[in-house]
Design a protein with these regions (language model features):
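Acidic/negatively charged segments and metal-coordination signatures
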Residues: 1-231
Length: 231
């Protein structure tokens, strides 16, 4: 990067107003992705209702933000027809035979969503929500014992290893274990086959406690306890 541009960015990051904008944008992004990783597909009205309960805004503002973030990150989809509008976790579209026009079949008609606090929803995409569970703590303890990780590394690990695996499980991707092995190997080096299997087992172990969009935000454990959800 040219030195004059580096100098500009350094000064930008020191500016208080700029830092406020960055903080606000990050919170919006984390909430958007937190909602979609928790609930999968939402009608635009429902998505706006949930978003507005935490970050107050009008519908036009939210639509603009969604459009900008979708164009930049490409992590979700917006579906609009003459009668219907949906916001969709892009991972769902990886399920065999599913196209964007079919996405309404995933919408929860009964609206029996699990409710979370604003803090939980804004931390859902950054691993903080999962960090309270024993299975996640056990997995993270193993990783920290074998590798050096700082806060940024943990966020990257969660976003690019844990979340893709959770999504693969929910769409029953036949290559989910192979994908998990490859994704781990991108960021960590396996010591041996035993170490690899232990690492993968610990990641797979968090599935039972993780919120699932296919269960409207409830976990596998909650489902087995008889929590009602809309398939």
């Amino acid at each position: 990067m040219p030195k004059d541009i580096q100098k500009y960015f350094k000064s930008y990051l020191k500016d208080k107003d700029s830092l406020k904008i960055i903080k606000s944008n990050t919170k919006e992004y984390n909430l958007i992705m937190g909602l979609l990783n928790t609930y999968g597909v939402l009608s635009y009205d429902k998505f706006y209702e949930m978003f507005n309960n935490i970050i107050s805004c009008d519908k036009e503002y939210l639509f603009d933000r969604l459009t900008i973030l979708n164009n930049f990150y490409g992590e979700f989809e917006l579906y609009f027809s003459k009668k219907e509008k949906y916001v969709c976790n892009k991972a769902i579209l990886k399920e065999k035979g599913i196209q964007l026009k079919d996405i309404k079949k995933y919408v929860n008609k009964k609206s029996n969503y699990k409710t979370f606090s604003s803090k939980e929803l804004t931390s859902m995409f950054s691993y903080k929500y999962m960090s309270k569970f024993k299975s996640f703590k056990k997995m993270l303890s193993f990783v920290k014992k074998n590798y050096y990780l700082d806060e940024k590394d943990i966020r990257v690990f969660y976003k690019y290893v844990i979340i893709p695996y959770l999504n693969d499980v929910q769409i029953d991707n036949p290559t989910k274990e192979d994908n998990l092995s490859k994704n781990i190997d991108k960021y960590f080096e396996y010591k041996n086959e035993k170490h690899k299997n232990k690492f993968m087992d610990l990641v797979k172990g968090i599935i039972n406690e993780a919120p699932m969009w296919k269960y409207n935000g409830y976990s596998e454990i909650e489902k087995e306890k008889g929590i009602v959800w809309n398939k």
